């Protein structure tokens, strides 16, 4: 969902059906900064709408229009919006280069080969660079590699220890707990 109207529909459905707490991210595209601002505001005028957690960016290919791989578009989102930005960190250019290496493969290992550690690290580094440049709050979704963890070790801090630096956090899914 990439518009405030769509988000409101999802929030209304959740309010009618959910028995637990909930929250949703509005999806970023390369050309919906104004929609993002409607949902989370700008740096100068942040908005807090209950149930909207922040902005989610897919830096590598996803579903529909949910892809923001252009650095200029990413920088615009980081610069012109408020709140939390959560990223699925995968470098689209590297994935496009590697796609031919797995063409015709259907084995489960093809996915990990195609979307390798470097693919994740490149996008993670770019996200962190933009967070530092803009002071934007950043969360790296679903950390997948030890090299990303090593890189982020110098960039992730508890909110109480971030004076002068943006808050950058991450998390990991159980299936990725096979770091080297």
Residue ranges and their predicted role:
Residues 34-180:
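Histidine/acidic residue-rich metal-binding segments in metalloenzymes
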Residues 14, 18, 26, 40-43, ...:
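Generic hydrophobic/packing signal
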Residues 1-17:
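Metal-associated gating/positioning segment near the N- to mid-region
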Residues 1, 20-34, 110-118:
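Active-site mouth loops of central-metabolism enzymes
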